[in-house]
Amino acid sequence: MAERNPFTPAFGTVPPIMAGRDRLLAELHAALEQGVGDPNLSSILVGARGTGKTACLTRLCEDASDAGWVSASSSAIPGLLDDILQQAQRASAQLVKPKPQRQLTGLSVGPLGASWDMGDEERGNWRTRMSALLEGLNARDVGLLITVDEVDASLSELITMAVVYQHFVRERRKVALLMAGLPSHVHALLNDKSVSFLRRAQRHPLGTIADADVRDALKRTVASGGKTIDEEALGICVEATGGFPYMLQLVGYRSWQSALGKAEVGKEDARAGMRAAQEDFREHVLASTYRELSAVDLRFAKAMLP
């Protein structure tokens, strides 16, 4: 039987151990437990690529049901509003029975015909349909957690969603909105006058992780897969991660692969894993970040070089 690698560098995959994010996750989970009125129910996770924003959103959605919530997850792409509505309807299907979409209001003979009333909710806009869903959920004391990844201020649907969410909060609906994005994208969103109220949302910067937390996560993850890791190898891996959650998973994954068939991850495995992970990081993270830089950003970056 092939060895199962316990590290998870795949995009959006939640690692078994969320290094350095315990306090943040506990704080946001407590907000769901507290319910209406907690300021963290409107939060924005801000961080560079590889800092674990998507993984945090995913973990919170997984935990939401324990606090009496259903969740609807999406990304800031065209079709956002419909996607949130459909995900919310699907998540609440066992709790809220949909009302008949149309009723027969008239019947004529010769020629045979019928007239139908589609109902207020079916004719209504996104706010009307979401309000009906929230009423059904809130009647059972169930909240709706909406998460939006990769925020993009240029997407009009994101602005619409945020404005409507503000009305839900004013109406004291049991609803939460957690968003995540790159610093420049979040800055652009908060500068949009239509959603200036989002400036009062809780902002949680996701920076690098302390070496002690990285070391602990690496050691525990290796142990969960049935191996041990040499202390020197552990030091090499910790230094190679640079405190980035994605690099933690990547270095761990590559080092484990190098140690297949062995009981221990040694220093040579760690060095091989470090080299492979650094190449992956350059290709998948740094190159993407570089391509997004403006001409002004590039001139500034070059000026900072020694």
Question: Which residues make up each language-model segment?
Answer:
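Conserved small helical "lid"/interfacial subdomain of P-loop NTPases
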Residues: 206-233, 240, 251
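A short helix-turn-beta junction within AAA+ P-loop NTPase domains corresponding to the substrate/partner-engaging
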Residues: 191-207
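Walker A/P-loop nucleotide-binding motif
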Residues: 37-59
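Conserved Walker B catalytic segment
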Residues: 117-185, 191-194
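A short, basic N-terminal segment
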Residues: 1-41, 87-90, 94-97, 104-105
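Conserved catalytic segments around the Walker B and adjacent sensor/switch elements
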Residues: 44, 61-80
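Conserved NTP-binding/hydrolysis module of P-loop NTPases
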Residues: 65-70, 81-114
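Winged-helix-like regulatory helical subdomains adjacent to P-loop NTPase cores
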Residues: 249-306
